Amino acid sequence: MFEQNLTSEALTVTTVTSQDQITQKPLRDSVKASLKNYLAQLNGQEVTELYELVLAEVEQPLLDTIMQYTRGNQTRAATMMGINRGTLRKKLKKYGMN
């Protein structure tokens, strides 16, 4: 039986420095750095619905990529994501991807 051995450690961001050095770091580190940068730029301004903003920034490209990977097969995409097909359809509709 196949045992899935991938963890969040497998989700990495690859960058190339100005000295052409290639580095990889976990996606979560990039998200954290982006959030810190965003908050620093607020300059004391109030922000609301940050949770929804961050989810949308991650969820939409996730859905797009998974739908391309599965060639539009919603059942397979939902299974890969660990959600039911109805939830997937609702999310696709939310982002105008249906």
Swiss-Prot record:
<dbReference type="InterPro" id="IPR050207">
    <property type="entry name" value="Trans_regulatory_Fis"/>
</dbReference>
<comment type="similarity">
    <text>Belongs to the transcriptional regulatory Fis family.</text>
</comment>
<dbReference type="Pfam" id="PF02954">
    <property type="entry name" value="HTH_8"/>
</dbReference>
<keyword id="KW-0010">Activator</keyword>
<comment type="subunit">
    <text>Homodimer.</text>
</comment>
<keyword id="KW-0805">Transcription regulation</keyword>
<keyword id="KW-0238">DNA-binding</keyword>
<dbReference type="InterPro" id="IPR005412">
    <property type="entry name" value="Fis_DNA-bd"/>
</dbReference>
<feature type="DNA-binding region" description="H-T-H motif">
    <location>
        <begin position="74"/>
        <end position="93"/>
    </location>
</feature>
<comment type="function">
    <text>Activates ribosomal RNA transcription. Plays a direct role in upstream activation of rRNA promoters.</text>
</comment>
<dbReference type="GO" id="GO:0003700">
    <property type="term" value="F:DNA-binding transcription factor activity"/>
</dbReference>
<dbReference type="InterPro" id="IPR002197">
    <property type="entry name" value="HTH_Fis"/>
</dbReference>
<keyword id="KW-0804">Transcription</keyword>
<dbReference type="InterPro" id="IPR009057">
    <property type="entry name" value="Homeodomain-like_sf"/>
</dbReference>
<protein>
    <recommendedName>
        <fullName>DNA-binding protein Fis</fullName>
    </recommendedName>
</protein>
<dbReference type="GO" id="GO:0043565">
    <property type="term" value="F:sequence-specific DNA binding"/>
</dbReference>
